[in-house]
Amino acid sequence: MDLRIASVFSGVGGIDLGFEQHGFKSVFATDYWSVACNSIQLNFPESEVICDDIANIDFKKIKNKQGGIDGLVGGPPCPPFSKSRFYIKEKKRGIDDIDGYTSIINYFRALEELDPKFFFFENVQGFVFKPHKSALELVESESNRLGYKIFHKVLNAADYGVAQTRQRFICVGVKKTMNDFKFPNPTHSNPEKKIDKTKNWVTCGDILSDIDFNLPEDEKMQAGS
């Protein structure tokens, strides 16, 4: 039987899709944006989708309706923790920003009410920057309060075969009674800093190499258009 996941701050369901591709089953998702919710419902027709502010959702009812949830996944909105926020002086950063704080609090409220075996928390690399130390401490304290041990790391998507150097903070929590979580070893590495037994990073050129550039339409196009 597939492990059943619920997602919050689901967007169009990218995290849900990744988990489904690795044997999990998405049974619940929620987002505030109706366009995103419509996309999730089309891509995961068997999932329950609620389009609402996460603060309004009773996750105990979701748990009871679904007959239990194995995992909670999601990435709270990243603007308060992004590098670009350092240049916007009029806005607060990290959990000093009310949206940054409440998004984390509501994530862990969902975790408490769903009481799954594990959780997956994703955010931008800036989440672990020194000025945002209190945000990571909040994640650590809430995890401990709810009976989870956590394992976190900044991962680069390029190290796992994706054609972009996207770095993200990944935090996985498991019940304290369960075995420790181990991050997978990189499968790829920067050819200039080669790691043994890994392939070179995949480039956009690699991805686009099989495209036929000799198209009839090219004759009608101007250079630079």
Regions found by a protein language model. Give the residues of each.
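Conserved beta-strand elements of the Class I
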Residues: 4-6
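Short beta-strand element of Class I
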Residues: 26-27
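Class I S-adenosyl-L-methionine
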Residues: 61-69, 81-225
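Class I SAM-dependent methyltransferase "Motif I" SAM/SAH-binding loop
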Residues: 9-12
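S-adenosyl-L-methionine
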Residues: 38-63
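Short glycine-/small-residue-rich Rossmann-like dinucleotide-binding loops
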Residues: 77
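Conserved SAM/SAH-binding beta-strand->alpha-helix loop
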Residues: 33-34
